[in-house]
Swiss-Prot record:
Sites where a glycan is attached: 133, 192, 225, 243, 246, 287
Family label: Belongs to the calreticulin family.
GO molecular function: calcium ion binding; unfolded protein binding
Name listed for the protein in its UniProt record: Uncharacterized protein P4H10.19c
InterPro entries: Calret/calnex, ConA-like_dom_sf
Transmembrane segments: 304-324, 360-380
GO BP terms: ERAD pathway; intracellular protein transport; protein folding
Cytoplasmic face of the membrane: 325-359
Alphabetical keyword list: Disulfide bond, Endoplasmic reticulum, Glycoprotein, Membrane, Signal, Transmembrane, Transmembrane helix
């Protein structure tokens, strides 16, 4: 058994070393939209991606993948802290799904290059009435990504009507699994009423649009297929994901892709964005853009210099500093962080979206604070 493990370990090292000397090349897998950056895009990417001009936004830049072992792999990185970073890329032609049985697949890769304290990273499909209008942010139809802030840590999925008045959120979402310095890949599959979420090529969530979403409005509207005009959760999802314009008020038609990142720290790196209508093509895209990167990021780099005595001392100092930093962040998160982050989640990002799996943590925190106050007041006497 030990011999077998030893063999596989060194096979990974050899494979990693082989990949290390190769150059990243964008794959040519069919898609509705695919963005894979290289050094050739340094001067041209701004012609494909634009930012709304009526907002105080952060700045993006196209840089070589930080810590990457593949030469010439590039991506977009955020440069400002505590600023929303928004970019929109128009599709060459507006696209509409042919039937509800055709899967909608949306995928992207994200890598926090600095500690992720609080923030989100979304990739959205948008519907713009005037794609050339850069004065405002277009409404999202499907918003997919990650959100990690204090006790909140999950993969976020929202489906929104074209007018923005109907919005449904996944309430039992899985954890994000984000790790500083590591690339995470997230893939969304919507087919009929089934929702599947993949993280790093593994299925982490399977649900149904009629039972696993909430925050639907209870408003009366006129609709030809609903006799009483009442929007149930399943009806909303059917309307939003359908393309039959004769029977649905909300056909699935999009003409743009949006990046939306906000974080307390800069340095959120995003690349390898994919949108299409084929699950098999999406899996090929995952294989060609992520497998090599995953192996390399999880393998020791064979080109690292040997550690000298002075290097050992610096490593020890760095370890001690890191421990104190982690202690400080832990105290901060469990005191002021809870209060601030809760306000952030309730009012800044998604209104009243509150994942059900975090409710117990919220209750325990509230009870702990409630019990601590009388003790604190007693000690002051």
């Amino acid at each position: 058994m030990q011999t077998l493990l030893f063999y596989f370990f060194f096979i990974n090292l050899i494979f990693a070393h082989d990949l290390n000397v190769k150059t990243y090349k964008p794959c040519t897998i069919p898609s509705v939209f695919s963005e894979q950056f290289t050094s050739e895009d340094i001067t041209t990417w701004r012609s494909r991606w634009r930012a709304p001009v009526n907002k105080d936004l952060g700045v993006w830049d196209l840089v070589e993948a930080p810590g990457s072992h593949l030469r010439d792999e590039y991506g977009l990185i955020t440069l400002k802290s505590n600023k929303p970073h928004i970019l929109i890329s128009n599709l060459e032609n507006p696209t509409t799904r042919q039937s509800s049985s055709v899967p909608i697949v949306l995928s992207f890769q994200v890598k926090p290059t600095k500690p992720w304290t609080c923030g989100h990273a979304y990739v959205s499909l948008v519907h713009q009435s005037n794609p050339k209008n850069v004065s405002k942010e277009p409404p999202s139809v499907i918003r997919f990504g990650v959100k990690k802030c204090g006790m909140f840590d999950y993969i976020s999925l929202s489906i929104i009507s074209y007018d923005g008045k109907v919005s449904c959120h996944l309430y039992d979402a899985p954890p994000s699994g984000l790790v500083e310095g590591r690339t995470s890949m997230y893939t969304l599959l919507l087919q009929n009423t089934t929702v599947v979420i993949r993280r790093d090529q593994s299925v982490v969530y399977t649900g149904d649009v009629g039972t696993n979403f909430f925050h639907s409005p209870t408003k009366w509207i006129t609709h030809s297929n609903v006799s009483n005009g009442y929007y149930t959760s399943r009806n909303i999802m059917s309307f939003l994901l359908s393309n039959n314009t004769n029977t649905s008020s909300y056909p699935f038609s999009v003409n743009g892709v949006e990046l939306d990142v906000w974080n307390e720290n800069a340095g959120v790196f995003i690349n390898n964005i994919y949108f299409g209508f084929s699950l098999s093509d999406a899996m090929k895209f995952e294989n060609e853009t992520f497998i090599a990167k995953k192996i390399l990021e999880n393998s020791p780099c064979p080109n690292q210099p040997s550690i000298q005595p002075f290097g050992i001392l610096m490593m020890l100092v760095s370890t001690i500093y890191g421990n104190f930093k982690n202690l400080y962040n832990c105290i901060k998160r469990n005191t002021i962080g809870y209060i601030y982050n809760s306000i952030y989640d309730f009012w800044i990002t998604e209104g009243m979206l509150f994942p059900m799996r975090n409710m117990d943590i919220f209750k325990i925190t509230a009870i702990s604070i409630g019990l601590s106050i009388p003790v604190f007041l007693w000690l002051l006497k």
